[in-house]
């Protein structure tokens, strides 16, 4: 795939793999395929069966897991067969489809990560507005657009590739295609994703440093001098954080399967959002203190949850880049120096990228309590049924 001599003589590859090499390689790739399918099916089941994971944004993870499953079932087995046999024996039509699917699923994975990053960014910068708009239907539309973008990028192999000749299945090696496909499938989405994530990190860092309500000091200071905002010296009741609606944390309500009883949510407001004087009774001071304590503790919990989510997102993005960057870098390099990259190294990077499809379920298990609990429930149920 790197040098013209090697590409045009695919039958030579059969001499490279003896039975002692082909058998362990087949077992290793076979186990990798099973791990990818098992782990990602587990993710899909967990999202649809666990109340803690039914938040609309987790549909992104379902679609991402589906892309990884498709890689394991429609791409990797044929890549393994082509590698071991040193020739393509599945026909010219399937060769074209296979190459397009390979690009499609890889591109879909990184565009999903871009969408997840943007979703997280909007949920932080436009908390109330975006959380109200973040419905399953809206997320499904975004996922559909993600797949359309990936499909558009993966179409050129079907149109411009050199048709498979004999037992060779290889993509178009024209410089313009290599460069454009690498930019569209990896480098551009990767840059967007990293920039968005850096912005997310900066915002999360600022909010972690500021105690509740500090980001609204100026607004509150202005309102204290406004006679319309006071009633007999009593300041109007306002939520202390834009992530709350009637005392309910938007993200907490969407990601937790426990109902939280909050005294702050029991406050009644007039049509203009002002607290009525007749509603203030003796003993309300204790309730106010309890309300403030509840809000402060919930604020700390929300900050910890944002940190964890941001960290998990960083790990997923980082692992994806680590797995696929070597391949795309060397593949782009071949456009300018066809024989400068050793074929063995290129093949290693090629298969190393596929390993990424098995890692997301492991990341969720290690860093996300909800997924870990859901996986345990799913697996324990199966064990109990076997015992019975």
From Swiss-Prot:
InterPro entries for this protein: ADR_fam, GPCR_Rhodpsn, GPCR_Rhodpsn_7TM
Pfam short name (any one) = 7tm_1
Composition bias, kind Basic residues: at what positions? 266-275
Implicated in catechol agonist binding and receptor activation, annotated site positions = 181, 185
Ranges in the Extracellular compartment?
1-22, 86-95, 163-173, 338-344
Q: Mind listing the GO molecular function terms for this protein?
A: alpha2-adrenergic receptor activity; epinephrine binding
Can you name this protein? Answer: Alpha-2A adrenergic receptor
């Amino acid at each position: 795939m790197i040098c013209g001599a090697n590409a045009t003589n695919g039958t030579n590859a059969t001499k490279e793999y003896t039975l002692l090499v082909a058998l362990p390689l087949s077992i290793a790739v076979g186990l990798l395929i099973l791990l990818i399918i098992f782990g990602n099916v587990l993710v899909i089941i967990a999202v649809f069966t666990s109340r803690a994971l039914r938040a609309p944004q987790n549909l992104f993870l379902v679609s991402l897991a589906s892309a990884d499953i498709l890689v394991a079932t429609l791409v990797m087995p044929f890549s393994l067969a082509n590698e071991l046999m040193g020739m393509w024996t599945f026909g010219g039509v399937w060769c074209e489809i296979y190459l397009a699917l390979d690009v499609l699923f890889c591109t879909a994975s990184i565009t999903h990560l871009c969408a997840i990053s943007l979703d997280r960014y909007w949920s932080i910068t436009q908390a109330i507005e975006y959380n109200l708009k973040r419905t399953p239907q809206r997320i499904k539309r975004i996922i559909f657009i993600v797949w359309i973008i990936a499909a558009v990028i993966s179409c050129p192999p079907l149109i411009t590739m050199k048709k498979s000749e004999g037992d060779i299945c290889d993509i178009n090696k024209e410089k313009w295609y290599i460069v454009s496909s690498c930019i569209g499938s990896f480098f551009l989405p990767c840059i967007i994703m990293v920039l968005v994530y850096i912005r997310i990190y900066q915002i999360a860092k600022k909010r972690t440093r500021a105690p509740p309500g500090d980001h609204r000091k100026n607004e509150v200071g202005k309102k204290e001098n406004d006679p319309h905002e006071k009633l007999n010296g009593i300041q109007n009741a306002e939520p202390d954080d834009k992530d709350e609606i009637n005392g309910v944390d938007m993200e907490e309500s969407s990601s937790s399967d426990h109902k939280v009883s909050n005294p702050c949510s029991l406050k009644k407001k007039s049509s203009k959002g002002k607290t009525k004087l007749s509603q203030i009774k003796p003993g309300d001071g204790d309730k106010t203190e309890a309300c403030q304590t509840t809000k402060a503790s919930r604020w700390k919990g929300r900050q910890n949850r944002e940190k964890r989510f941001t960290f998990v997102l960083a790990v997923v993005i980082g692992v994806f880049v680590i797995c696929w960057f070597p391949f795309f870098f060397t593949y782009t390099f071949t456009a300018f120096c066809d024989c400068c990259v050793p074929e063995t190294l290129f093949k290693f990077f090629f298969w190393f990228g596929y390993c990424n499809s098995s890692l997301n379920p492991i990341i969720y298990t290690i860093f996300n309590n909800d997924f870990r609990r859901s996986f345990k429930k799913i697996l324990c149920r199966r064990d109990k049924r076997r015992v019975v």
